[in-house]
Amino acid sequence: MNWRSEHIWIELITGSRKISNFCWACILFLGSLGFLLVGTSSYFGRNLISLFPSQQIVFFPQGIVMCFYGIAGLFISSYLWCTISWSVGSGYDKFDRKEGIVCIFRWGFPGRNRRIFFRFRIRDIRSIRIEVKEGLFPRRVLYMEIGGRGDIPLTRTDENLTPREIEQKAAESAYFLRVPIEVF
C-alpha cells in the first residue's frame, strides 16, 4: 500500500507477514509434527498416528532419524512463526520533499536494536540504482545511493520484479526525488 501526495510519498513494506511465509510455516509445522509422532510411535511400539503402523518402522535407526527431523523441523517452524508474529522486516519508506527528509523504518528482531530507523536529507541522495543479475536465478534490486552512507535497498531481494516493474519503480522514485537513475 502506498500513499502519495505532491510533497510526501509513503510506501508501506510487508516484511515477513507474507502468504508464502504463512504457508511454509504451516507445512513445516505439520510435517515435522508428523515425523516426530511417527518416530515416537516407533519407540513406544504403539500407533500414535493411524496412518502408519508402528511395527513397520524400527526405532533404531529410522525412528531416531525421524524424531531428529521432527524436532529440527519444529525449531525451524517456531523460528518462522516468531518472525511472522514479530513482523520482522516490515515498516515504511517516507519521502518528504517539503521538509527535504527521507525516513526509512523497519522492524527487526526483539532486542536493543529492534527498531531500525534511517533518516537523511534528500540532497544527500546521489542516485537511484538498479542492479540486474540475469541467469538461472535472475535478481533485480533497486537501491538508493547516498553520499557517505552507501546504498540502501528499496526493494526486497526476494521480490521478483519484472524488468518493466523495476524500471517503473525506479522512474517513479527518481522523478519524485529528482535524482538520476543508474543501471548496473
Curated annotation (Swiss-Prot):
GO process terms (BP): photosynthesis
Protein keywords: Chloroplast, Membrane, Photosynthesis, Plastid, Thylakoid, Transmembrane, Transmembrane helix
Localization per record: Plastid, Chloroplast thylakoid membrane
Membrane-spanning parts: 19-39, 57-77
Similarity-based family: Belongs to the Ycf4 family.
HAMAP family, A to Z: Ycf4
Entry protein name: Photosystem I assembly protein Ycf4
Organism: Nymphaea alba (White water-lily)
